Amino acid sequence: MKSRLPAQVSLLSVLALVASFFVAATAPANATVSRTSLIVAMSADLDYLDPAATMDNAQWKITYPCYQRLVEYNGADTDVVPGLASSWKISDNNLIYTFTLKTGNKFSDGRVVDANAVKYTFDRLLKIAKGPADNFGDLKEVTVSNPTTVSFILKRTSPQFLYTLAGNYGGIVNPKVASKAVKGDMGQSYLANHTAGSGAFVLTEWKKGQYLKLRKNPYYAGQKPYFTSVIFKIVGDASSQRLQLAKGEIDIAEGIPTDQLASVGKTKGVVVVNQPSLTVDYLYINNTKGNPALSKKEVRQAISYALDYKGLIDVTQAGFATQMRGPIPVGMWGRDPNVFQYTTDYAKAKSLLASAGVSNLSIDLLYSSRKPWWASEALLIQDNLAKAGIKVNLKLTDYAAARQMIDKGAFDLSLGVWSPDYADPSMFMNFWFDSGSFGLAGNRSFYSNPAVDKLIREAANITDQKKRTELYIAAQKIVVDEAAYGYMYQKNYLLPMRSNIKGFVFNPMLEQIYNLQTMSKG
């Protein structure tokens, strides 16, 4: 992606300063929770903590502060800065990334973090070959020159490579894990419920169904955390979370429904963090394997004109979202701010259907209960499209079955949600539109256009950001005109917490993850 180029201020960091706000009522700090402890209420327990095996942000809230990475996201910004590495160089052919490690970093058992630990981490990740390994498909091998110098050799140009290292799966693992292997599992059973990193915290206790407890890593070389302990408490009932937050029995509540947050923000001593995220809700429109009518651009455009975007946002997100303008959300570079945006226009939708020679269209809408707002969203879309003369049959199924159907293309329409794994527009443009990535690989509308393939593939294989942006903008104009998806809305990140919690920084690439090492209580 980028070598140590001059830092750029991302659009999102500006938005976070300008658009974010706290809905709050100030009050003296409640002393119920110890000043040196932080208690976070979660709705459900976690299941698996190995950074080489989990792709779930819910697990990352534990693992991210317990590990360090070669590079880290820069506060609220989506650019990266040195982490365990003090610097790095990229070869002229963009295939070799060589990192120089800082000295003094140690794992939670006192072992020094060196180049061999870095190599062990990525060799292990690739051998385990689970979800996180997919982000390193371009990685050929890792070599060690000396204890503080490590090189990553790529198979091909990968402009996003540097950013993948800042993700949870880039956490450097203590090689002692090798001694914890059971039946050749490379320590997976051990790291499922332990941590082995050099981050500010270490997991010390996990009582299933009750809580997880982190304590300060005594060997952490960075800024010493304010909190001596952090407790992630399982509180399944939303009303209980709300009551405990109001009483000061917890510091942060993750499970309060969106439609309650406006009133929660008026509670004495409580604030609600509200900042733009990079998570989007969109509608898969099966271009090639669904109802034959959906292969016609005019029909897909009609669906896009029939969606009541404001109604969807108001009902499902209590107004805490913004209509998308094309596939790339605000805050991600490479976005075309002037690309066409569909508006609700039932007359236009009917006209497009007529011009396509389509009448009495009946299509299925697939969804699961994975997201609590999808049931109401499905009903709204059914009602919206009915106003344009399209009958929508709702098909509710379990999440696993829905994923299988989506992967096979056995649907007409389906609800979807997406957030990027790394800060690069390829996470949207190449995943969503490349005809070589049908199904769960990313292209869930089974969209195919050779012109778009050419643009996005070229963009994904060069490092010049200006040129990449030009290519992605050209592709955006096509996929919006062809209504490859229903581009619905970009969600806000909302988090209720006690007003005496200080220093929380939201990074859109680290949603549900806390910067525990720099947070405190006032």
Label for each model-derived stretch:
Residues 100, 134-180:
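Surface-exposed binding/hinge segments that line
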Residues 217-263, 391:
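Ligand-site clamp/hinge motif
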Residues 39, 114-121, 147-153, 199-200, ...:
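Alpha-helical secondary-structure segments
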Residues 86-131, 145, 151-153, 244, ...:
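Aromatic- and charge-enriched surface segment that lines or borders ligand/interaction sites
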